[in-house]
Amino acid sequence: MSNEIKPVCVIQGPVASRSGYGDHTKAICEDMIKWDKFDVKIIPMRWGVCPNTMLDDESRPMVKEVKSRIINNLSVQPELFIQVAIPNEFKPIGKYNVGVTAGIESTIPKPEWIEGLNRMNLNIVPSAFAKEVFVGASYEKRHDNGAVEKISLNKPIEVVFEGVDTGTYKKTNQPYPAMDSAMEAIPESFCYLFVGHWIQGDLGADRKDVGMLVKVFSEVFKNSKNTPALILKTSGATFSHMDKAEILKKIHDIRFPLTGKLPNIYLIHGETTPEELNRLYNHPKVKAHVSFTHGEGFGRPLLEATLSGKPLLTSGWSGHVDFLPAGLANLLPGTLGKVPPSACNDWLVKEAQWFNVDYSVAARRLEDLFVNYIQYIPNAEKLRQQNDEKYNLEAAGKLLVETLNRHLPAFEKKVTITLPKFKKIEAPIVPPATSP
């Protein structure tokens, strides 16, 4: 009698991290477990200094199941290895290797990223933009012996979007005491909301362009009798008191040179549960969402925001335009420009370009949305319905499975053999022969 053993799939990524990569890793783990084709094991990784608290609440669906699959090291080579990371970290550990990355927020990836993608058998990115940038990248690498090697992507790459939990992120009037209590301190009845990290870079050079959002908003609505407010749900890389103080200082330094009576800007800093964040998206005082982002590999917070059914004003370039069609979304025009030196890091290189919003147009759109708000509601509701149907977790999981099925080889089948049990037969004791 024999039993077939499932091939082993090891997923390595920041499954417990409070980050976009953490959300993505956790969703992939859940999809692979539900598929039930593999014996899924998970190797957790850190993601910078982001809090590792994603799996703390075991009452959430699948959390216990995900935690039960966590291992500390590999004892055998897995048939399938899925790594969720930036491409230069990709390592082909399995018999078949899949690299998953949010991709790129600018026009040029580092050569090391293309080399990393080429180490894997298959690569998955969340947007058409990310795929286009990687496919179009080409470099020449000069070796010590003088030989020149052309580097370009030579492995398959597929688009599988990041799904959103539409059971949590949805249009709702349900109160949430913790968030409602924080919002009581805001007197304005019309607030714009930004959600995202405020990371390195001078004014106009942080990737989400939060600094210029603060400046433009302050200038548009200064000295007005009836003014909206801007809520920033943001942080640097941590939720520490020092981080909060630094964010407040940035806001002050941007607004201090401006004259006149400025509109209020409020900071919500610290960790929130998905339910609290969804309540913020849906709070009656939050009327619209806004982001001047320079570029997104996908832009999950923007997708979440659309599910509130409220207008979204954002940049018209990069990964998020997949789920923000021009006919329904309010996309801001702009131009491509060099990534500033203060923004360059391990993945944003000085040779690359990103998107700069036309701030004069953005200013007019902010004002028009405030004055003519009702006119923006129908398209926002249509976009909510469309994204709820197309970009949920189930649809993303289905696409992931379909994509893997197209590419995965037939792994060698392993079986365990159970031998039948036999009764122990005692041999008769024969006395030793004696010599005559």
Model-derived features: where do they sit?
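N-terminal pre-catalytic "stem/leader" segment of glycosyltransferase-like enzymes
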Residues: M1-P78, A229, K398, T403, ...
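C-terminal amphipathic helix plus adjacent low-complexity
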Residues: S2, C344-P436
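Extended catalytic core of nucleotide-activated donor transferases of GT-like folds
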Residues: N3, V10-Q12, V49-V133
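Conserved catalytic-core segment of nucleotide-activated headgroup transferases in glycan assembly
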Residues: H24-K26, E30-D31, T166-R279
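Donor nucleotide-sugar binding/catalytic pocket of nucleotide-sugar-dependent glycosyltransferases
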Residues: L122-A178
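Acidic donor-binding loop of glycosyltransferase active sites
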Residues: R279-G297, L307-K310
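Short glycine/serine-rich donor-binding loops of glycosyltransferases
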Residues: G299-L302, W317
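Short hydrophobic beta-strand element within catalytic cores of glycosyltransferases
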Residues: P311-T314, N330-L331
